[in-house]
Swiss-Prot record:
Catalyzes the phosphorylation of D-fructose 6-phosphate to fructose 1,6-bisphosphate by ATP, the first committing step of glycolysis. Negatively regulates the phagocyte oxidative burst in response to bacterial infection by controlling cellular NADPH biosynthesis and NADPH oxidase-derived reactive oxygen species. Upon macrophage activation, drives the metabolic switch toward glycolysis, thus preventing glucose turnover that produces NADPH via pentose phosphate pathway. NCBIfam families: 6PF1K_euk, PRK03202.1. The modification Phosphotyrosine is found at Y640. Residues 401-780 are annotated as: C-terminal regulatory PFK domain 2. Keywords: Acetylation, Allosteric enzyme, ATP-binding, Cytoplasm, Glycolysis, Glycoprotein, Kinase, Magnesium, Metal-binding, Nucleotide-binding, Phosphoprotein, Transferase. Allosterically activated by ADP, AMP, or fructose 2,6-bisphosphate, and allosterically inhibited by ATP or citrate. GlcNAcylation by OGT overcomes allosteric regulation. The modification N-acetylalanine is found at A2. InterPro entries: 6-Pfructokinase_euk, ATP_PFK, PFK_vert-type, Phosphofructokinase_CS, Phosphofructokinase_dom, PKF_sf. This is ATP-dependent 6-phosphofructokinase, liver type. Its EC number is 2.7.1.11. In human PFK exists as a system of 3 types of subunits, PFKM (muscle), PFKL (liver) and PFKP (platelet) isoenzymes. GlcNAcylation at Ser-529 by OGT decreases enzyme activity, leading to redirect glucose flux through the oxidative pentose phosphate pathway. Glycosylation is stimulated by both hypoxia and glucose deprivation.
Amino acid sequence: MAAVDLEKLRASGAGKAIGVLTSGGDAQGMNAAVRAVTRMGIYVGAKVFLIYEGYEGLVEGGENIKQANWLSVSNIIQLGGTIIGSARCKAFTTREGRRAAAYNLVQHGITNLCVIGGDGSLTGANIFRSEWGSLLEELVAEGKISETTARTYSHLNIAGLVGSIDNDFCGTDMTIGTDSALHRIMEVIDAITTTAQSHQRTFVLEVMGRHCGYLALVSALASGADWLFIPEAPPEDGWENFMCERLGETRSRGSRLNIIIIAEGAIDRNGKPISSSYVKDLVVQRLGFDTRVTVLGHVQRGGTPSAFDRILSSKMGMEAVMALLEATPDTPACVVTLSGNQSVRLPLMECVQMTKEVQKAMDDKRFDEATQLRGGSFENNWNIYKLLAHQKPPKEKSNFSLAILNVGAPAAGMNAAVRSAVRTGISHGHTVYVVHDGFEGLAKGQVQEVGWHDVAGWLGRGGSMLGTKRTLPKGQLESIVENIRIYGIHALLVVGGFEAYEGVLQLVEARGRYEELCIVMCVIPATISNNVPGTDFSLGSDTAVNAAMESCDRIKQSASGTKRRVFIVETMGGYCGYLATVTGIAVGADAAYVFEDPFNIHDLKVNVEHMTEKMKTDIQRGLVLRNEKCHDYYTTEFLYNLYSSEGKGVFDCRTNVLGHLQQGGAPTPFDRNYGTKLGVKAMLWLSEKLREVYRKGRVFANAPDSACVIGLKKKAVAFSPVTELKKDTDFEHRMPREQWWLSLRLMLKMLAQYRISMAAYVSGELEHVTRRTLSMDKGF
């Protein structure tokens, strides 16, 4: 990956013009992308034009193409849809339409186009690019432009961003809008659950996605739905009987509701559509259950974008500008995609080709291949859904007993992880215990065996159902060892924050004294602070960022109404500045003070002066985030006094300490799924390790790799031994020594109009799409 030279970049932006348009169906997060492209373009010295109403505006020209300034895209990051409008355009599909579009671009000197839309919009852009030379020749022949003009603007560069709630584009893990659409679906499912339980009802929910089952699949996984229909994996013949059996069985076990999720493109093995009304009639006729159909429709496109979509779009928008600046006549039109947590550029047509192949595989009834072509994460979701949805009695009972506990502060997604771990353990024939109140509960013997149905309905619950404590094992090792012996525990799964990691480390270090601790252990990092070594993302931090972001959106609205007001907002996170930084990007904050990025009085002075300058423009509001432990002396109160004094007569100041509301209510779809997957993967790893260390009728594990932290690192799931992570940990400040998200701070400062050296900006490389990159199990 190449670091970019600032001066070269400034020069490369000068004299260039970038046009940005949104096309096709709208998606939440498009505004964040428009904002990022506009501001990054202006930042590097280019002119940026907003093209209104998609390709229609491009063809019609005139008032539809306007030059943007920094303020044009202010206060739009929190809005759903697209402020520059989108339209499906017939004219652009004709040669005349594209010729008119080329003329309009040349009139404004635009030779760089950033297109935000679905695969149709991006394919259209590529056709436009390939015809560009001949379109200009025709314009010269018609006498509309001179030959000199044609030579000056002889080449068109294209960078695409995929904006589609369906997540149906090959080559990217997530498209802009998908996460927000999942938020809408989960909000509806959570609301429906309460009414269904009151009446003992069955609900058939139809979700969008055209020919792609991603939304249906992920919402089924995140809600623990009883049955699922997706186009990529049609049910076996005779599914009607299986489904009714399953629903009857769930009801007889005391469940008061059944949820059936159906993708709008659902089909059976013969390609015949399966409709929600057909499924409803089937349940009513066969089982006599009170059944209702809810078609979610365009609700899924609406509402405010989630934090994930705002950050994804901002990151992709900036990367798209870099791709346009670095493009040459020989580089292919590219699309900026996401792989793990990395931005990657892929050739647009390779992705479109692969996306078409999925549809072709489905048309030819090659369903297994279609699932594979959707990518590793789709396939993985499908396998995990099948594993957890329905209990299959284990082939044989194992001799192993495992215990699961929560340690640290409550975090959203803990219950999802416990649920999936319990069910995976049971399906492997293990005896599964849960421990209440963390290590303290283990010392006191608060241990109980659980069955498959004991964890039903846990997925959408926030906090910790098992109860959690911060106490470390150190002071009560004797009692803990005693209970491990009494219950015959062979493995521990600890779901929690920094204390969970530190606690397991203490148990491992005590193995020399207590043979009972020579068991297999795994930590699932779950904390809103995202400060556990061995993973890029902790469970619960996505929910926390969304909770903090919603609060900041409201605070910003208050500031907009009051005029000339600056809010200083304090976030949690201990010494770790992840929450403050990521929330800052999601709400378009002016600054975010964190411990990892040391600041002094000079920096504060620059910030205050920047704020005073900003108040002279039309944007008369400010938002500053401060992590709770970012500085010993520059406290929230100090910042309030400083800003109040320096801003006297220009702006006034207020503070807000967000506090425990950041632990969030119901977990976000990301945390429900991430928790579910971590629970499954951790349990599979524990099972495998137990078989490895089982000798002569007993478990004896004392190798470093028998006690690990599971986490997502860059693009894959990794298991890191706690003893090896010790050297990478700053125990005094309770966080990893190196943190990947610090690179995001550059984005925060640039989008807030701070002039900074871009030497640290790392732009994505151009990679290629192959079947291997898609079906390779990237972990998630």
